[in-house]
């Protein structure tokens, strides 16, 4: 990866030993085979287990580093949205910081372990997500910082508030799943001058807004025109079907959401693939002027954050943390997400102008491993690196075993 050293050199207050360690760490994570823990890392680099454990406790400004990668990779004029989600990390023991019961989507129930909450920026056109901030969710009372009136949702809101100034200036929409469709979270996002796009409950308590003439009588003007019934969509505007999915019918209306106490652009996707049993989902946005089709496209881009969790768990060792202290855990989680940002940024530069954007983390990791192995051959066999890298078979050997996306 050619951009690592340039980005680290730009960061103020970063000493040469830590700069060298981070550059080595990112490359080592991509080339190693096995679990990403201190022992395995020590087998693939010149640092001992003790040195690795000590460096993982050193402070580092991860949001600043992630932001610098974003500036390198993303076009500020492109369509961008932010996404916020959490992922469960299984962990045993008694002394690990943050152990608690968190929801595990794979098991569809709460289990004992850790949770990492991630704020990402998504390029809507190229369907590519980049981590901006990752933090461990404290369990129980620690998540509320001792304030009984606070909840875990307030912790997520605080995680969004802190790096708000690092989001691209052109970004105006924040996409989250249905868990975050709560008043305290939506209000916090609105204070940050962002519009929320989220999934709503199938029985969301919404009412139509009254737009007719007001009779001349005493009293307040009429505001509402009846409760929304998702089984009867005759009062919604019919937007037709999706071009790529003709079985999906779209209906939209501007409604008042009673629990959130605000106007929403409501879009209902009706799935008529099985005409006898049609199914629907409801999406909402705090921007009433947002086009219904555009709302669907922006919300669909939110799922790119799931690929960050998937790739970091499969390839960069998000689940393999050997540490127990809070600082070391935070370092490990961000160190697992950072190589994904770097690889995606370099891949976007190589595929500049190509549509659609094709990316395979498995191929990148295989190529990095092959390149490292070839470098070791050249070093220990006293081969001329210039001659080897200019050989016609070098790229073939470097891409040996790569998996196409």
Where does each model-flagged region fall?
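Short, basic interhelical loop/turn and adjoining N-cap
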Residues: 16, 43-55
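Short linear loop/turn motifs
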Residues: 53-58, 327
């Amino acid at each position: 990866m050619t951009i690592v050293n340039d980005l680290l050199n730009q960061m103020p207050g970063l000493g040469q030993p830590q700069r060298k360690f981070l550059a080595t760490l990112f490359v080592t994570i991509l080339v190693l085979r096995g679990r990403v823990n201190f022992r395995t890392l020590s087998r693939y680099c010149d640092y001992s287990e003790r040195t690795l454990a000590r460096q993982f406790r050193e402070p580092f400004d991860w949001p600043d580093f992630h932001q610098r990668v974003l500036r390198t990779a993303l076009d500020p004029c492109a369509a961008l949205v932010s996404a916020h989600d959490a992922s469960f990390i299984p962990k045993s023991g008694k002394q690990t910081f943050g152990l608690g019961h968190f929801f595990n989507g794979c098991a569809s129930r709460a289990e004992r372990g850790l949770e990492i909450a991630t704020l990402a920026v998504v390029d809507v056109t190229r369907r590519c997500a980049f981590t901006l901030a990752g933090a461990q969710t404290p369990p129980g009372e620690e998540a509320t910082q001792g304030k009984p009136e606070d909840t875990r949702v307030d912790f997520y809101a605080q995680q969004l508030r802190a790096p708000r100034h690092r989001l691209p200036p052109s970004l105006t929409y924040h996409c989250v799943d249905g868990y975050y469709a709560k008043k305290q979270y939506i209000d916090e996002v609105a204070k940050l001058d962002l519009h929320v796009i989220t999934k709503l409950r199938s029985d969301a308590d919404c009412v139509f807004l009254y737009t007719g003439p007001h009779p001349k009588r005493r009293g307040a003007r009429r505001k509402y025109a009846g409760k929304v019934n998702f089984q009867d969509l005759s009062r919604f505007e019919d937007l037709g079907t999706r071009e790529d999915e003709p079985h999906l019918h779209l209906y939209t209306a501007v409604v008042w959401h009673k629990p959130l106490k605000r106007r929403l652009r409501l879009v209902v996707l009706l799935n008529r693939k099985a005409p006898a049993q049609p199914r629907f989902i409801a999406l909402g946005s705090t921007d009433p002027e947002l086009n219904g089709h555009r709302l669907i496209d922006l919300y669909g881009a939110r799922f790119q954050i799931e690929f960050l969790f998937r790739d970091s768990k499969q390839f960069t060792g998000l689940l393999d943390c050997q540490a127990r202290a809070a600082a070391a855990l935070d370092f490990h989680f961000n160190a697992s997400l950072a190589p994904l940002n770097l690889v995606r940024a370099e891949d976007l530069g190589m595929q500049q102008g190509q549509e659609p954007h094709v990316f395979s983390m498995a191929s990148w990791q295989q190529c990095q491993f092959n390149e490292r192995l070839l470098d070791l051959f050249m070093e220990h066999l006293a081969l001329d690196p210039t001659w080897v890298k200019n050989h016609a078979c070098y790229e073939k050997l470097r891409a040996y075993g790569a998996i196409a996306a």
